Amino acid sequence: MSRTASGKNGTWRNWGGNVAARPVREVTPASVDELAEAVRRAAEDGLKVKAVGTGHSFTSIAATDGVLIRPQLLTGIRNIDRDNMTVTVEAGTPLKRLNLALAREGLSLTNMGDIMEQTVSGATSTGTHGTGRESASIAAQIKGLELVTADGSVLTCSEKGTEEERSLFAAARIGLGALGIVTAITFAVEPIFLLTAREEPMPFDKVLADFDELWAENEHFEFYWFPHTGSTNTKRNNRSAGPRKPVGQVSSWIEDEFLSNGVFQVAQWVGRAVPATIPTIAQVSSKALSARTYTDIPYKVFTSPRRVRFMEMEYAVPREAVTETLRELKAMLDRSGLRVSFPVEVRTAPADDITLSTASGRDSAYIAVHMVKGTPYQGYFTAAERIFTAHEGRPHWGKVHTRDAEYFAGIYPGFGEFTALRDRLDPDRLFQNDYLRRVLGA
């Protein structure tokens, strides 16, 4: 187990560059026992403890001035159980590595988010999700968890455990790092399958008018709306018998790298320097991506490269409220004078039973707003958040928001159960930081 200062001048920064922390020490445990020892030693020294993955959260959920746990040595697959169709993986394993390993075994997760750079524990602990009629959240695919609690104990929990274990399982799948440090996750898997993706432009008004039909007819539907235009780019993913027809290398480079990252990055720079050009840039951007259809294994369809750095806010609203919420967002932008060069992303998720999941107990739709890194975003995000919260929106735990414990107590029926469990597992708040103090209370 190594102990070092964190980053340049002892400073850790997140991917978005908006969160920085200076931990007293950084620990890289090579085993669960070493991690438990690091937790016990931090408690003895009176220091707070947080684990950090790849830093893709825009909130300070992983920041600490105490002990920062780096899980990069806690990686790899522990076990594949083909009888029960599960895989148990070390918590620091990047999703990309997990997907590649599963594919080699002829297996796959059921759903994924937009990217796969995050660690499995970081992605699940913050509620990372994709889009889907019957599936979306990565955490909802969890069948079992192992975590180290504040006293250094190693606990396991699953949906088939004791009543106490089931209570922990319901909360810890999206535990925000508040209940302990996750060390291993058991996911449900299935035989690898093919998805056919159909991407095509569609007018904004038509998408909203046909939204219920588009959602019902597709296993995975999402779209991007370009502010200052009436245009969207839609994506429909559905299971396919094949044959496999991946995007060609040239087409992939043009669409996913040159247009979606290279040219898009330049357009963002121009828009940031000369905001008056943004409506024109938006019109051009909305027409740049052409319709295409391709068929491939799941992670190659669900995920795509994201190299343009940005800031993001995302809220889950009741699915039946999404079209009205989007109309209000568009009306706000039309009258506000704000200039937004980044598309708005819209996805869906079915209700689940995870205590602090943004889809807990209700079918949900996600609306994500973005601004390129370095561009003032507060005015846009504040106005958008006002609209989202008016529809009982639940913010993504790892994305920008201003909500606090009082708000969450009103929109999560199980909020009190979660905080009571936290009181039992971490009474001295070893895993506390400023973010958790705000969203969960002292």
Label for each model-derived stretch:
Residues M1-A442:
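Noncatalytic alpha-helical scaffold of FAD-dependent oxidoreductases
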